[in-house]
Amino acid sequence: MKRIIYSFYIDIPEDELDIFDRDVLKKDEVPRNIITKNEFKYNYFKLLANKKWYAESIGVPFMMFEYDLRYQKFEKEVKKYYPFITTYNVVNFYKLNLLYELSKTYDEILYLDFDVVCLTKDNFFNNWNLDKGIAVFDNTFKVNTMETITKQTQTIRSPTAKYYNAQAMLMEKNLSPINKVINTGIIGANKEHLNKLKYFDDFDNDIKTMKNLTTNYDVFPKKIVDFFGYDNETLFSVKLNEHNVPVQWLDNKWHYFFDRQGFIPKETKFVHAINKKFDVCWRRYYA
């Protein structure tokens, strides 16, 4: 059984950052993308060392991908055919492209977003039998009801936006709109289920559908459609449903969604630092 753990980091140029939270920012508040860019730079070596430490502790090789020729080629290709897709979304499609590239060599793969901090030496692969399905986190609990949505309650990256965007795509495919909001910050998968997912098999048509839906008000009101976009997690949810792919939901121990809580529970194994408060993560790590 060949296994691999990998992560990925691109320092997106400031002039290519999309200020997606403009409408929810308070006066003098720094946009989330700027905070992310700065915190990744400041914590780069610690974040990299942490993932290497975890991989070594469970005896699995680790690979780090960054701004190399392979990424540049992918970005150039995507922006050539889909110039309306932001660099942020290109980056997130690429991390899934890497999943497929690695599946050509490895049987089981664990992907960790660069803002994930490992707090355990417990072996992910021994705790999650990937023959049972792709292991991801269910973010549906963060979805707002349609009547409560305003420009101030969400952004284009909010779970709410992804939920209704996936509904719209599924309906376009004449499928049930029932879906889960997937978070792709941590993914455990094997070759068999990735092949069944067929994430990139119909990519051109999927992106065209997503583009058409950004201006289609036939089913959803404008206040919903205005938040539709080209998110990798939206498409991931659609593909899980479209191809009936087995899935198992990571619990809070293995994917702790660290956002506004201000603390990390003792039993946590992987912290996904959405808020980029790495100082809290390091205090927990070194405790």
Report each predicted region and the residues it spans:
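N-terminal anchoring/stem segment of glycosyltransferases
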Residues: 1-94, 101-105, 227-231, 274-281
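Short His-Asn-centered micro-motif
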Residues: 6-8, 65-66, 112-114, 120-121, ...
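Short, solvent-exposed loop/turn segments at secondary-structure junctions
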Residues: 10-13, 68-72, 116-118, 141-142, ...
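Charged, glycine/proline-rich intrinsically disordered loops and linkers
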Residues: 16-39, 74-86, 144-173, 210-222
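Short amphipathic alpha-helical segments and helix-helix/interface helices
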Residues: 48-52, 99-100, 124-126, 236-237
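Acidic carboxylate-rich catalytic motifs and surrounding loops in phosphoryl-/glycosyl-chemistry enzymes
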Residues: 59-72, 112-114, 246-261
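GT-A fold catalytic core of metal-dependent nucleotide-sugar glycosyltransferases
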Residues: 87-157, 189
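Catalytic core and acceptor-binding pocket of nucleotide-sugar-dependent glycosyltransferases
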Residues: 169-283
